[in-house]
Amino acid sequence: MTGTQAQSSDNAQQPDGLIIAAETRRMIWNAVAVDGDRVFVAGPRWAGVNGPAIALIDGKDGLIPYPDASWNAWQPGSDVTKTFVNVNAIRRDDHNGLWVIDTGSPTFGGDPLPGAAKAVRIDLATNRIGRIYPLGPRVALPGSYVDDIRFHGDHAYLTDAGRAGLIVLDLRSGEARRVLDGAPSVTAPTGRPIVMDGEIVRMPDGSPLRVNSDPLEVSPDGRYLYFGSLHGPWSRIETRLLDDPGISASELASNVEAWADLPPVGGTAMAPDGTLYFTDLANEALKKRAPDGTITTVVQYPGLHWVDAPALAGGFIWLPVPQLDRLPLFHKGTSKVVWPIRLYRYKLDAQAN
């Protein structure tokens, strides 16, 4: 990985403490996970680049397909159950596992291919697939975009950014359930647009981009799941209610509470003390929300343009910068991406992780 200090294309001075950890012209990195000295990155197929779905950065600038080449070799018409069709998130758990969230849809806004949507756990000690959790047609619906994952005990929680809702996954049985389908707490509001470079991000038909349930975190004590659409605001609900399949949909909905009125965010990470780090898209900034609700700016820099899915590891917060709004999809087929794509890291206070 390169430690080169550099300036972005707008010549703004890079802030002290912000380090370029790696860069590439092959992938659009929207996710990162760290295991000791190993750094993993991932990016969605619909971004239109030619790198692997998941890569291990080899310490120079190379990208090694992970866990192997075959899992990264999906082509239209090939097996979707043992390959990555479209990776949207990777996440390291507390038991030496790397989780991969495959939306199952190779196109943005498309339907998951039959049998393709899944959560895959890789054993980091052996670099082999430990278990595959299929997200069947009752969970990954037409229009679903399974987005990200968090854990508590024997359960995992996933967001669906396409068909608004949450997914509860029993890690022992493998059974998955949809909850809060179409609820206001998981649905993108119409009055909070995503603004980047001073303009509303729009779909090819000209309508504002709306992303349903996307960011989520579990409180350090495991009591609450915090969640919301990408646009905000955030809500919370007790995990014990989510974990109980006997709780009715109406009772579950009645127990959703307002939590934090955050702006549109690219991604979040929660520290052990309950501090929520989030990337403020419009302001190209990393901010933090203290447990008492106070919000402060950690670092602001034009190079942090649409930071997605940060990760806390080794005393740093790792910040992939995919520049998603600059992809051709959102600009009538013309790319506005400023190459190279970069992964930054920023040193945090000792208590952060």
Question: What are these language model-derived features?
Answer:
Residues 19-52:
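Beta-strand-rich domains and repeat architectures in extracellular enzymes and scaffolds
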Residues 25-36, 78-97, 101, 138-157, ...:
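Beta-rich, blade/repeat-based domains predominating
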Residues 40-73, 109-111, 124-125:
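Beta-propeller domains
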Residues 41-48, 100-104, 111, 158-162, ...:
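Conserved beta-strand positions in repeat-built beta-propeller and related beta-rich domains
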Residues 60-99, 103-107, 112, 131-139:
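Blade-loop segments of beta-propeller domains
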Residues 63-73, 130-134, 177-192, 244-260, ...:
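Beta-propeller fold detector
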Residues 106-155, 159:
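Asp-box/WD-like beta-propeller blade repeats and closely related beta-sheet repeat scaffolds
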Residues 172-176, 237-248, 348-352:
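Short loop/turn segments immediately following beta-strands, especially the blade-tip
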